[in-house]
Amino acid sequence: MRNFSDILLSQDWQNPHIVKWHCRTPHVPLHSYRTEQEARLDVGGNRQSLNGQWRFALFEKPEAVEPAVIDPDFDDSAWAHIPVPSNWQMQGFDKPIYTNIQYPFADRPPYVPQDNPTGCYRHRFTLEKQALTESIRIVFDGVNSAFHLWCNGHWVGYSQDSRLPAEFELTPYLQEGENLLVAMVLRWSDGSYLEDQDMWWLSGIFRDVYLYRKPILAIEDFFIRTELDALYQHAELRVETRLSQVTRHHQVQVALFDAQGECVARSQALHTGQRVVDEKGAWHDKTEHSLAICSPTLWSDEAPYLYRCVICLLDEDGAPIEFESAAVGFRKVEITQGLLKLNGQPLLIRGVNRHEHHPELGHVMDEASMRRDIELMKQHNFNAVRTAHYPNHPRWYELCDEYGLYVVDEANLETHGQFPMSRLSNDPQWVNAYLQRMIGMVERDKNHPCVIIWSLGNESGIGTNHHAMYQWTKQRDPSRPVQYEGGGANTAATDIVCPMYARVDQHQPHPAVPKYALKNWISLPQENRPLILCEYAHAMGNSLGAFYKYWQAFREFPRLQGGFIWDWVDQGISKWDSEGRHYWGYGGDFGDTINDRQFCINGLLFPDRTPHPALHEVKKVQQPYQFSLSYPKLTIHNERLFAALPLELVVSVLCDGQEIKQERLPLDIAPRGTITLDLASLPMLPEHEYHLNAVLLCREDQPWSNAGHCIASEQWCLQPRRSMLPKITHAPLPQWQQDGDKVRIEAANQQWQFNRQTGLLEQWWQNGQPVLSEPLRDNFYRAVLDNDIGTSEAQHLDPNSWIARWHAAGLDKLRVECDDLRVTTLNESVEVVIDVAHYHQQALALRTRWRYQIFGDARVELNVEVMLCSDLPPLPRVGLTLALPVAENPVSWFGRGPHENYPDRLQSAHVGRYTATVDELHTPYIFPSENGLRCDTRQLQVGALVVEGHFHFSLSRYSQTMLDKAKHSNELVAGDKWYLNLDAQHMGVGGDDSWSQSVHPEFLLTQPHYQYQLTLRVKASSPQ
């Protein structure tokens, strides 16, 4: 046995050749049921959870640990209690560190820092004498990053790879009654060089720990395969079982049960060694069963029907010793004709990358959180998930089997911080570490029907070690494709071309790893593989512009079979400031000086699983039903491949945003089917705007939603709004007067005051009450988005980023001068024309001309012209901004909504009439930025102020300046005014990625001249 000092001297955690000591061979999760009924129902078994409160102490390095901590008599009463599972940084020990690419320590593989925080855990448990007659194993489902284990003072073994089980045989070290476990967990190990995965660096025993008992001769592993015939009608169930010892006398029997618990098939009991494999004979610790299954119900994401396979080990007399079982889904994954297919049908992957993240627990995932994630995915039309970038909690796969979600299962491997990235991937010293990460994942997860693709890892370049992983995997499991993006996404180590952030129509040249436009990639010579983006549509902050273009391409080109959005959830950690205000922390907020700021904040959901507005866009764009309208004929095509959903169709007609007619009818559309309906036509008055809405609802409850859930929708404009003749007013002509620099106009109990020096409408009164809190001003800037910042740092702006170009042009700090203000009395109005010049330093940047026409009924017609006078970059926005007193009534508008939308992200935002509070109009992005826009607005009412025209608006308690300065949401402090932005044009948000200029050309504001018109009025009283 190794003593403590030997372990410290050996430094196993800095030796790439050593990844395990005394760990059991990887295998599927085992339960050792003792009856067939237990195995069939997946209840009982012989597991004993060790989760709970353990004693814990943190040391600055392993050498600082007292050798006596492993002794049963050591007094740990002064140690803290810590929950297992947990990350110790989330329990107040040490600090979380976030980096994207760079290692948070000196890059000298395999060596790690001498100051290496080391957590020591002690836990006592009891065993009865009867338990000691069997083999007792302990399983740690996840420990970061490496650990040594002792039991009752005896060294048991060592393990690294934080995302796979470490299993040890404890039997030799156990005793009747009380037993002691001691785990010494190191924050850093040579394995950390392989786990550089754009996430928080957190440590500890963060997944379940349990004991389980097995007979001395027992079922050690089993591999279930389902093979379908050429017509996908009948199947063969193949089960390979491995025992813990060689035996010629024991037998194995296999039975299959359907979802109702009825036995579908039962095999004969077979001895080991039935098939000779080479000149030395057969495997006498293995059996191979084959059962013919007639017309099984097939498994898919749409109809995840599960059987249960029960495996029984029989003794020499035919009596059962133990049982193991697993869920079985009959399905066939294959690549034929350049297409990834399931059960013969080409898949369209509606996928997302998901990190395991909890805002209070770190990397600890409970079942409720996992179920919530899956239900949200299904509700938003996802059918696939990539376990970015490591094997997930074992329960995750069971839930994906159950709910129906395709999984790309990814090895715990990323060396993004290496130079070059492939350095370790080509080093034979590391080949075993690479292989063991792949082997452990495949062996653990091989029986899950949800796993349709294996992944070799992420962002590690390409090297000989990857090819070894690929070859082993294809030999072990030929039934699934293997993918890997590294080295250019189309190497010999991938069955699927799986690029990240390739664009639909734009090549991204690179001397080593070019990214071709998607439409061109699939037409390259000799390239006949399917293309599925392993990452695309970088959802960082206010993002996902032009997402719909990807889906236009996916639907047009069959070999473009979808992709996985980056990513699912913002990796923010809950924090509270000194005033007790909650906010989400990111890199640098915990004293982590090496960090990548908010680059961990790029999810479709906030950390608490509240959806971002962009999630609505994703749901709409990838919805599995497609609509077309040739009024009054409505055609609906079902993109689902395997199972029809009972639906209810709701068709409504809107006149000027108000629903005037609705029809509802039950609907059933066969998979891949199309139906056409005749709608009742409706007479339309020429002076009104009409829209048709079609919404498909789930008619019945689903495992992932209630009846009434909207699964798809579409809107068409039946008749656009027509230009109206100028309104004729019969009210008395407004009166105006000048007093020094002030020009005051009066009409209908309202007054307007202009300042000749500034050119501003300083105030507007109604019955003596001020309408404005701040004047109307030109607005050409926005609080920068993450996509505007790109790769910029606080002290160094990326010169190609939008923020750098806008700041260089002075758009955030233009000096404004009024050149002229003229007042003219017209037939029905008083006209005020103001010429304004905008300077950056001494250079003229823009000119604007504001033309107010104030009518006798107190209506204000505003016309603004914008003329660019210098070589400016595309503008963030063209419009005006003002501030209003806080109002009590909800805001109402006629335009796109109800959620936030932008010119390149509005497919999901239908035109209608909506109401919301000012807080509901604000999107609290973790890194504050421009937010809350509602596009194509015809009418807006805020308090008593009514705005009409065609514009985009946002209303917030916070100004653009406040948003631009804040780094966290708690830094935003509301005052006594609301800030209203009225935009004629607004640049897109982009989102193909977040580090280059990703706004598509048609969503850039590049014209030299803009003009817009608005009508403003104040209602006599606010609506009830």
Curated annotation (Swiss-Prot):
UniProt-recorded Gene Ontology molecular function terms: beta-galactosidase activity; carbohydrate binding; magnesium ion binding
Marked site positions, Transition state stabilizer: H355, H389
Binding site residues for Na(+): D198, F599, N602
Cellular component aspect of the GO annotation: beta-galactosidase complex
Catalytic activity, reaction form: Hydrolysis of terminal non-reducing beta-D-galactose residues in beta-D-galactosides
EC number: 3.2.1.23
Cofactor binding comment, as recorded: Binds 2 magnesium ions per monomer.
InterPro entries the UniProt entry points to: B-gal_small/dom_5, Bact_Beta-galactosidase, Beta-gal/glucu_dom_sf, Gal_mutarotase_sf_dom, Galactose-bd-like_sf, GH-type_carb-bd, Glyco_hydro_2, Glyco_hydro_2_AS
Binding site for substrate: N100, D198, E459, E535, Y536, A537, H538, N602, W995
Binding site residues for Mg(2+) 1: E414, H416, E459
Domain of life per record: Bacteria
Keyword Oxidoreductase: no
Any one GO biological process: lactose catabolic process
Top-level enzyme category: hydrolase
Positions contributing to Mg(2+) 2 binding: N595
Keywords: Glycosidase, Hydrolase, Magnesium, Metal-binding, Sodium
Cofactor(s) annotated in UniProt: Mg(2+); Na(+)
Active site (UniProt): E459, E535
Subunit structure: Homotetramer.
UniProt similarity note: Belongs to the glycosyl hydrolase 2 family.
Name recorded for this polypeptide: Beta-galactosidase
Gene giving rise to this polypeptide: lacZ
